[in-house]
Amino acid sequence: MTDKTEKVAVDPETVFKRPRECDSPSYQKRQRMALLARKQGAGDSLIAGSAMSKAKKLMTGHAIPPSQLDSQIDDFTGFSKDRMMQKPGSNAPVGGNVTSSFSGDDLECRETASSPKSQREINADIKRKLVKELRCVGQKYEKIFEMLEGVQGPTAVRKRFFESIIKEAARCMRRDFVKHLKKKLKRMI
């Protein structure tokens, strides 16, 4: 007999692995990390001092002192503390005093203009909400009809949208709602 077979006959536990034991490095690494997590305590995280957490702090502004944050904002806008316009790379003033006359409406208009949604995105969002409302049992249909009024685009797009919602309502066994949708579709055409 060979040495291996004698060893199996004498001590079978050395050959067969236990279900929780594994020799792979990833298993051992997970075990060590779990042990470290228990040692650190429940409130501490494993990435507390890592570069990732520092980057998150920089993004949120928690790691930047307020004095540096103010100077960074001033550098970004091009204004100094005395409201003189400056060149972005230098501290020399360019012109006289600059005043701003923005109202709340101007800011709202700029926000909507900076991130406009396309008709497809708006319609896809409405469709997702409509399907969610359709699947809720016992819902009133007024809310769904209000959402359907918000569909944007030409009549062909609206017609396709109504047809897809009719199919979804039929699939959800909403026969009375399908009748109402078909009436609205006929009025629209």
Curated annotation (Swiss-Prot):
Tissue specificity statement from the Swiss-Prot or TrEMBL entry: Testis specific. Expressed in cancer cell lines.
Keywords from the named record: Nucleus
Location of the protein in the cell: Nucleus
Bias kind Basic and acidic residues: ranges: 1-23
An annotated GO cellular component: nucleus
InterPro entries, A to Z: INT_SG_DDX_CT_C, Integrator_subunit6
Presence of the UniProt keyword Nucleus in the record: yes
Presence of keyword Metal-binding: no
Pfam families registered for this protein in UniProt: INT_SG_DDX_CT_C
Annotated region described as Disordered, given as residue ranges: 1-27, 83-118
Family: Belongs to the CT45 family.
Name of the protein in its database record: Cancer/testis antigen family 45 member A1
